[in-house]
């Protein structure tokens, strides 16, 4: 179980340890714009994110809206595209729709439906959840999150939104799943050749869910092929989604099917209503033939399958909250617009802080960027929480805090000024420039070196 717990002393100890590591690492950190191998978009730092309630009611409401393209419908980067349907030869566009229960089960399988790191309590804010392979947040969005995509090699506003804000993360994950569905028949097989591949039929999402984690098979480092010998004989016990079974014994889509039918409980209430779904029956000769590993050959045209039976026709969720209710109306505000930092003769630098406030409602995302390589910022992006949301028990609540210090080895002179640009993708208003004046008690020698002033 990956639920958060509030452990004040432990969190303070972790924070102190992290601060020590931060101070020790400052001089070694590569600034944005410097190539880094195997890094994520915000490396070496981690943005802050908001973690909502333990019951995940805000997240499941956002998923309901995303499933019918009512979460961020006017933003092409986050909106659902038309969902194709039809056989391999007759695909046509249809209404944007994904079964909400499927998205909820994927969110649980990916992250236990959490946006922030495990140590962050519910109803709070803190470091975002980022996996070893750059999966971000609730939907573990990896696509577009492995390198900075903004100007001058800095992270983009979209990347900040995905990393910090649950709604944008959910919307992007839903769009990626829709793109996997629409990849049939060119890149993945078609499920539901006998039901016009109707996306309202839950079982027809089998290949798209497989592809969400990676359309991989035998020979891959992680295979999701149901007939891969590593998973044993069929039928196998259903995945229970309760932490008692090894996930490595199942292909990804069977993990999702198991969680969809057996949601976790919190406070005696399931996170979402249980929704059974039928897997392809590999004891059925036609189904086993289609899903034989001998057919694992691009373009997978021999892997098309009929809808597994019994099939489940899914209706859109009832009582969907509006985008305005889920997103609120954030208002971007900040404190100081000029700060002064000092660096003593030993190279130790003072720190400055800038508070980012949300004068409205909902979750405000902010991002800080600079092209001045001697400025070190932490976190590089974060959140500020509006008056309508509960946010307690953390240093990052309700305001965001940007901490600024100096890498003295990169100072261009003993007296220097740099600029940090603060902006909000969803808070309106203009970007705000923070001027940082630096005074060092040593003179600068060759580039990248310094010496104490006598």
Which role fits each region the language model picked out?
Residues 321-359, 442-454:
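Beta-sheet-dominated interaction scaffolds and their linkers
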Residues 79-88, 94-122, 141, 208-213:
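Short, functionally critical alpha-helical segments immediately adjacent to catalytic or ligand/cofactor-binding
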Residues 429-441:
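C-terminal edge beta-strand
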Residues 37-70, 132-135, 142-329:
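Non-catalytic cell-wall polysaccharide-engagement segments
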Residues 352-354, 402-406, 412-426:
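A short beta-strand micro-motif common to beta-rich folds, especially ectodomain repeats
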Residues 116-129, 221-225:
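Short, solvent-exposed loop/turn and secondary-structure capping segments
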Residues 328-338, 359-403:
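Surface-exposed binding patches on compact interaction domains or structured appendages
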Residues 4-35:
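Secretory targeting and sorting signals
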């Amino acid at each position: 179980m990956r639920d958060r717990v509030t452990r004040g002393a432990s969190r303070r100890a972790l924070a102190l340890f992290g601060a020590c590591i931060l101070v020790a690492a400052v001089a070694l950190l590569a600034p944005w714009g410097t190539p880094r191998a195997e890094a994520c978009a915000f490396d070496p730092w981690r943005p802050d994110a908001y973690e909502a309630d333990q019951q995940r009611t805000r997240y499941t409401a956002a998923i309901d809206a995303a499933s019918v393209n009512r979460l961020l419908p006017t933003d092409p980067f986050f909106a659902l595209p038309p969902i194709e349907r039809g056989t391999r030869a007759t695909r046509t566009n249809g209404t944007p729709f994904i079964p909400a229960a499927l998205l909820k089960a994927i969110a649980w399988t990916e992250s236990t439906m959490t946006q922030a790191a495990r140590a962050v309590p519910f109803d709070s804010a803190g470091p975002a959840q980022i996996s070893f392979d750059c999966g971000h947040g609730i939907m573990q969005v990896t696509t577009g999150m492995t390198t900075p995509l903004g100007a001058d090699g800095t992270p983009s506003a979209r990347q900040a939104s995905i990393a910090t804000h649950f709604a944008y993360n959910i919307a992007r994950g839903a769009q990626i799943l829709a793109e996997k569905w629409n990849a049939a028949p060119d890149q993945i097989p078609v499920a539901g050749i006998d039901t016009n591949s109707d996306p309202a039929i839950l079982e027809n999402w089998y290949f798209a869910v497989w592809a969400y984690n990676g359309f991989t098979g035998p020979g891959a480092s992680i295979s999701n092929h149901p007939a891969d010998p590593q998973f044993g004989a069929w039928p196998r016990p259903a995945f229970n989604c309760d932490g008692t079974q090894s996930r490595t014994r199942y292909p990804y889509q069977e993990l999702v099917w198991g969680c969809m039918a057996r949601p976790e409980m919190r406070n005696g209430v399931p996170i979402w209503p249980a929704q059974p779904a039928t897997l392809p029956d590999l004891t059925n000769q036609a189904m086993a033939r289609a899903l034989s590993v001998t057919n694992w050959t691009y373009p997978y045209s021999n892997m098309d399958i009929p809808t597994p039976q019994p099939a489940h026709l899914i209706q859109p969720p009832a009582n969907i909250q509006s985008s305005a209710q889920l997103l609120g109306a954030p208002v971007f505000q900040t404190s100081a617009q000029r700060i002064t930092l000092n660096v003593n003769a030993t190279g130790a630098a003072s720190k400055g802080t800038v508070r980012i406030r949300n004068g409205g409602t909902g979750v405000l995302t902010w991002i800080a960027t600079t092209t001045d390589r001697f400025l070190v910022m932490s976190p590089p992006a974060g959140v500020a929480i509006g008056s309508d949301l509960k946010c307690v028990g953390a240093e990052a609540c309700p305001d965001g805090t940007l901490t600024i210090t100096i890498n003295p080895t990169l100072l261009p002179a003993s007296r220097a000024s740099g600029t940090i640009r603060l902006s909000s993708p969803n808070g309106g208003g203009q970007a705000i420039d923070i001027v940082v004046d630096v005074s060092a008690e040593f003179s600068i020698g060759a580039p990248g070196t310094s010496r104490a002033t006598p």
